Regions:
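Short glycine-/small-residue-rich Rossmann-like dinucleotide-binding loops
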Residues: 228-232, 255-256, 274
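N-terminal ligand-binding/catalytic initiation module
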Residues: 1-135, 139-141, 151, 343, ...
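Glycine-rich Rossmann-fold phosphate-binding loop(s) that bind the pyrophosphate
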Residues: 160-161
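Rossmann-fold NAD(P) dinucleotide-binding segment
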Residues: 219, 231-249
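Adenosine-phosphate binding glycine-rich loop
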Residues: 10-18, 257-372
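Short helix-loop-beta connector
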Residues: 147-154, 177-178, 246
Length: 374
């Protein structure tokens, strides 16, 4: 039996709709609904693992051996299956190296493979930088449609890079009253590029404020989004005092920051998948947060310290499926942790792949006409 698969480069992905913000947000909503129904598989014996990561050594006696010689140096393989209308398997693979920036390359270079659920045969091999960026922005926005105040007008972006752009575009798509953006960045170049992006792509935003400090950026904001790249030392994470946070704010965290324990314990704490954080808690024993720098692992550390109970960590799927009420007042502060899962990449990748097939986009490549050894 012959097998071929579709190769989609970045231009093909754009032509097939990978940048459709509203479509991606809806795909994430459907994904998490399926997740809540247990119609998925992740890696690992308990089907709850983020993926498998290669960590590089600091030194080696072997010439040319890859080293951990800078921030964010790793390889990750992330397999998954997603059911429902998607009924597709696949894997995201990425290599991350901050030194890429000096070569004119993105920090991370990502690819997604989609596979037939029954045979394992490849269906598609696709450029995934935009795919991953879009789903990373769409997940917080999907959650914001349940967790943010309906009258939210001001959003803060701490870290105006690629993820900041996709997050803001997605927030705008689900929060019709947003009209003001407060931005805190590290370089004038990133601030200028982000401001230009807003003016060209997001006419709903009428006011842009460039802030000199995190405190200035988060004060009086209805939605606060951290999309920063952090270093390994927790003390280097941006610090946020609870006194700066407006009542009723939603703090969206696909990144890391430092909060006072008592403040976090007073907030409603929501995660994308509590089992994911439990798996990290088991793999990286307490304290987990310095090792896995996603705020949900800080929640599990607080649980370990007896400052919160396990039931204080709420799954977004329980809110989507109406097993939990979600926001119960306009005054409560909610912190949402986004760990990221390959089911999200498979969902959006599968959607774009099927669009590409319908539109005749991409290059069909043969695997074999007949397997040589079968």
């Amino acid at each position: 039996m012959s097998i071929d698969f579709l190769y989609l480069n970045e231009k093909d992905m754009i032509a097939a709709g990978v940048m459709d913000v509203a479509g991606c947000v809806e795909a994430m909503r459907e994904t998490m609904s399926l997740f809540g129904k247990k119609d998925f598989l992740l890696g690992g014996p308990k089907a709850d693992e983020h993926g498998l990561q290669i960590n590089f050594p600091a030194t080696s006696d072997i010439e040319g051996f890859p080293l951990d010689d800078g921030p964010d140096r790793r390889f990750n393989a992330m397999p998954a299956y997603l059911g429902g209308k998607y009924h597709i398997a696949g894997q995201k693979f990425y290599g991350s190296n901050n030194h890429n920036l000096q070569k004119g390359l993105p920090r991370s270079i990502l690819m997604v493979t989609l596979n037939d659920v029954d045979t394992g045969a490849p269906l598609a091999y696709m450029s995934a930088n935009l795919l991953s960026a879009m789903r990373t922005g769409a997940m917080p926005a999907m959650a914001a449609s349940y967790l943010a105040r309906k009258d939210s007008k001001v959003v803060s972006i701490i870290g105006p890079g690629v993820m900041g752009k996709t997050s803001l575009a997605a927030f705008v798509s689900v929060c019709p009253n947003l009209d003001t953006v407060k931005i805190k960045g590290r370089s004038q170049r990133s601030l200028d590029a982000f401001t230009r992006f807003i003016r060209e792509e997001l006419p709903q935003i009428k006011k842009i404020e460039i802030c000199d400090s995190v405190e200035e950026a988060v004060k009086d904001s209805d939605i606060i989004s951290f999309t920063t790249t952090v270093r390994d030392d927790v003390s280097s994470f941006p610090y946020i005092s609870g006194d700066w946070i407006k009542k009723g704010a939603l703090i969206s965290m696909p990144s890391a920051a430092r909060f006072d324990d008592d403040f976090l314990a007073s907030c409603k704490l929501v995660v994308d998948n509590s089992k994911l954080y439990e798996a990290w808690e088991e793999e990286y024993p307490y304290p987990t947060y310095p090792q896995v720098q996603i705020i949900g692992t800080k929640f599990t550390d607080l649980k370990h310290d007896g400052k919160i109970e396990a039931e204080d960590i709420i799954d977004i799927t329980d809110i989507i499926e109406k097993r939990h009420p979600g926001r119960t007042s306009d005054d409560e502060i909610i912190v949402y942790s986004v760990g990221g899962m390959p089911v999200e990449d498979i969902a959006w990748g599968g959607t774009v792949y099927r669009n590409a097939v319908k539109l005749g986009i991409g290059i069909k490549l043969p695997l074999w006409d007949k397997p040589e050894m079968a």
